[in-house]
Amino acid sequence: MIIETERLYLRELEQTDIESLSKILQDEQTMYAYEGAFDDGEVQNWLTKQIDNYQRDGFGLWAVILKQTNEMIGQCGLTWQDFSDQTVLEIGYLFQREFWHNGFATEAAKACKQYAFEQLNAQEVYSIIRDTNAASQKVAERNGMVRCGEFIKHYRGVDMPHYLYRAVSYTHLRAHETSLHL
């Protein structure tokens, strides 16, 4: 287990999670921000990428497990993403549709932000969200993030407008404020 919250725990994805992951990544409505559901090969590539991220970075998108049932209901975690001319640490989340609107994404995303600031000593974290994904934008806002940019992301042959959300570590902000007053 990587992170535990009141109702959830987050752990590394494993090959045995492929069926649960497919419920998320092969659902058309869940994946509309990605221009449609993934096929079996894309799901396997997604899983392999996360396992590679754990080995390379020590983190990635983690399986979100509902404590009450021990069921994998989504994924949430931290990944490096390219934005403009820099690489940023992103909090990402995707949940099975039947678990939407229960606060699980917000609960997991807040825990990932705390993990980034306290365990990884990150100075800031971002969320990159499709302009049409109002629910994910609300999760970012509830996670203390502020929209700070807009850009076009090219994916699956489509130009997709996205918003960039950002949160700054309080510790980093205090250090910056202190240095300004000296």
Positions of PLM-derived features:
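A short, well-structured alpha-helix characteristic of acyl/acetyltransferase catalytic modules
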Residues: 1-48
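Acetyl-CoA-dependent GNAT
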Residues: 15, 36-37, 41-90, 168-170
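A short, internal acetyl-CoA/4′-phosphopantetheine-binding micro-motif in the GNAT/acyltransferase core
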Residues: 65-67, 92-101, 130
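Conserved acetyl-CoA-binding loop-helix of GNAT-fold acetyltransferases
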Residues: 101-115, 138-142
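Conserved GNAT acetyl-CoA-binding A-motif
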Residues: 120-128
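Conserved beta-strand-loop-alpha-helix junction that forms the acyl-donor binding cleft
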Residues: 127-137
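Conserved catalytic-core motifs of GNAT/GCN5-like acyltransferases
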Residues: 128, 146-162
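Conserved small/polar residues in nucleotide/adenosyl-binding loops
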Residues: 171-178
